[in-house]
């Protein structure tokens, strides 16, 4: 059993994801998107769509990668209950391919944001958040230019009513404020689940908050443990 990290042209966080998973004792391997998943779905513990700049972010971030044939395999795997996580550019691919609602667009500050942010856990009942308690504040790095989550008012209300919001940007005390929102995301949303709670997308990078030598936080381990 293993976790597949999908490598698109322009991905640059696939090795990071593999290393982070291996660090917490989870077998992981990279798969080139043109090769597909083939028959390996039967032996999968999960799939990660990693960060980067797939296809140079032409058209829209994640838009071209969302049309890769492997996405059909990923959607089929999601329907079978296999965990799928989209991180940063992978989150954009997830939204563009319909794995989750909404879209990620240009930051309201119109610049690339690279910093460590605070996130408040909104729903601790999913595989991605069961390592935490609701209301817990964690620290995870971000690095994106198109991370502003947008969604229609009706869909946003559905996300809230269906408890699909995993994380919101907050301050160190857990307060949801405009100042704590690094990109202008609606409702300070940083991560959500899709039609299945085994499918999630988030802009922050949990793989960059897993190895202690990489920074001050290892809070990302709790998210990646969903694959264990």
From Swiss-Prot:
The active site is at residues 88, 205, 207. Gene3D superfamilies: 3.40.50.880. PROSITE patterns: GATASE_TYPE_1. InterPro entries: Class_I_gatase-like (IPR029062), PRibForGlyAmidine_synth_PurQ (IPR010075). Its EC number is 6.3.5.3, 3.5.1.2. It holds the Pfam family GATase_5. Pathway: Purine metabolism; IMP biosynthesis via de novo pathway; 5-amino-1-(5-phospho-D-ribosyl)imidazole from N(2)-formyl-N(1)-(5-phospho-D-ribosyl)glycinamide: step 1/2. SMART domains: GATase_5. Part of the phosphoribosylformylglycinamidine synthase complex involved in the purines biosynthetic pathway. Catalyzes the ATP-dependent conversion of formylglycinamide ribonucleotide (FGAR) and glutamine to yield formylglycinamidine ribonucleotide (FGAM) and glutamate. The FGAM synthase complex is composed of three subunits. PurQ produces an ammonia molecule by converting glutamine to glutamate. PurL transfers the ammonia molecule to FGAR to form FGAM in an ATP-dependent manner. This is Phosphoribosylformylglycinamidine synthase subunit PurQ. The gene is purQ.
